[in-house]
Curated annotation (Swiss-Prot):
GO cellular component: host cell cytoplasm; host cell nucleus; viral envelope
Positions with a binding annotation for Zn(2+) 2: 286, 289, 383, 390
Protein name per the record: Packaging protein UL32 homolog
Family affiliation: Belongs to the herpesviridae UL32 protein family.
Length: 484
């Protein structure tokens, strides 16, 4: 019985999971020798971008970007149509998947879960149809899932302004394609028109449906989270040597036409901006957004952490100091750092996860401790107070939908109700997501005179747009220059 967002069905041994991960790695080209670059050169964003440009397979990138054309059919919609011709009742499971996706944060982990569950649903329900080799045979790419479930949201309610919706999707695609192909500029998208967009009150929740989801699931994806980003710069301060070796061995043993993968970048094509970079102790993949999508326990801890920072004291401390003091207090209270000391490999600590602290306010175990250790004070500060994508994810997620189900005897009725009510509501407006996507692209682009002018023009309107939609955030001018 399909329940959605079920970690028991998607373990790190899952062939579907590992197949998706494999095809979300980029294939490197042989490195190009350079007399000006040495092994001891200081690492900065300009050097990293330059190195990436010379190492990635441009032919593969061009092939992947085919899915980012507005006049190309949606391959996921085509598969859905094929499945419905075989068995119309299949749409009920698909509707539950879409409903859960609707309240999921836009993170690589969320996209991996949605993609894996979709493939699992079609393979298990239609064994007479050959759905093997979807990625290997270029039937789909991960960008088909990006567009279908998180950008255009093909399953969602019909909007009145079809052309504006089409143009927003077109702009999203252009942003991804320009960053994927490492172009020198970002598409010039004017967001000022969204400031005059009429703000009509709209429904953002389905309380009648949501109240049916009352049974907590024992779902938790933190092990998968460590697995997918082990051996990458996302975990550059917390090594997982054995876990990384296991992952690389597993995905390389899959039958595939990929002969080599860019290991340190990880499955970066799962990210909203498919570009692996670090800057000022932040990475282009936010682990705290990933953690939100992992379980209700982890979501509630992050909610407690944020409230503790806000309530820390009545004095006018800077937010970064509040973050540092609160995390130090939590570590001192939980004592997990006493058991999980400096190790050369934390893989065993992940699988054992034997140390945990819980009280009336929060639960913290080895998994969360290691993620906080990796993100550090700056990463927590950026997530809660600086990054508009993180804040949009916080607004979007509904843990009661993602991590709950209903009684076994009622779940089919729930799926039917979801299907016929067709309420896939957008919490954050589609044009706001576009503006945030553009902001994230500006964070990683190589600076030049043209880009600086474009960024300055964009930020003026972006700041006003965030205020209009009640995004209480540190000045984006700071964030766009200092973090990724």
């Amino acid at each position: 019985m399909y329940k959605g967002w079920d970690s028991e069905a998607l373990s790190i041994q899952s062939e579907i999971v590992n197949e998706i991960l494999l095809y979300c790695y980029l294939t490197p080209q042989p490195p190009i020798p350079s007399e000006t670059t040495t092994a001891t050169s200081p690492t900065n964003i300009e050097n990293e971008i330059s190195n990436l440009e010379s190492s990635e397979n441009l032919e593969e990138l061009k092939r992947l970007s085919v899915a980012l054309n507005i006049d190309r059919r949606c391959n996921i919609c085509s598969i859905v149509n094929l499945c419905l011709k075989q068995n119309k009742s299949w749409i009920y499971d698909y509707s539950l998947l879409c409903y859960k996706c609707n309240y999921a944060p836009k993170t690589p982990l969320s996209l991996l879960i949605v993609s894996a569950e979709f493939i699992m649903l079609i393979r298990e329900r239609f064994p007479n149809i050959n759905f093997d080799g979807l990625f290997q045979n270029n039937i789909v790419s991960i960008f088909d899932f990006h567009v279908h479930f998180f950008i255009h949201r093909c399953f969602a309610n019909t909007v009145n302004d079809h052309i504006q919706s089409e143009n927003i999707t077109l702009n999203h695609m252009a942003i991804i394609r320009s960053t994927l192909l490492k172009e020198d500029s970002i598409p010039h998208i004017k967001i000022k028109k969204f400031l005059t967009k009429k703000m009509n009150p709209k429904k953002t929740q389905s309380p009648e449906l949501n109240k049916k989801l009352t049974v907590p699931m024992k779902t938790r994806f933190t092990t998968l989270l460590f697995y997918m980003w082990s051996g990458t710069n996302v975990f550059d301060r917390v090594p997982f040597t054995d876990l990384t070796i296991r992952k690389h061995r597993f995905i390389k043993n899959l039958y595939s036409n990929k002969t080599d993968i860019e290991l340190t970048a990880g499955p970066i094509l799962l990210a909203q901006i498919p570009f692996s970079i670090t800057k000022n102790k932040t990475t282009s993949v936010c682990l705290l957004c990933e953690l939100m999508a992992a379980s209700k326990q982890d979501y509630l801890f992050l909610k407690y952490l944020h409230q503790s920072i806000m309530d820390y004291c009545q004095n006018n401390l800077k937010m970064i100091d509040r973050v540092q003091f609160v995390i130090a207090d939590i570590f001192e209270k939980t004592k997990i750092h006493m058991h999980v000391k400096n190790l050369s490999d934390y893989s065993k600590a992940i699988f054992d996860n034997e140390f945990s602290f819980s009280d009336d306010n929060f639960t913290l175990d080895t998994h969360v401790y290691l993620i906080l250790r990796q993100t550090g004070t700056v990463g927590v500060y950026k997530h809660f107070f600086c990054d508009p994508l993180c804040l949009a994810n916080c607004k979007t997620i509904n843990p009661e939908v993602l991590f709950n189900t209903t009684d076994a005897g009622e779940i089919q009725d729930l799926k039917v109700t979801i299907c016929y009510r067709n309420e896939y509501l957008s919490i954050v407006e589609k044009h706001v997501w576009l503006a945030i996507h553009l902001f994230k692209a500006f964070q990683i682009i190589k600076p030049n005179h043209k880009n600086k002018t474009q960024i300055a023009e964009f930020l003026k309107d972006f700041t006003n747009l965030l205020a209009l939609h009640h995004f209480d955030i540190v000045d984006p001018i700071f964030t766009v220059n200092y973090y990724v």
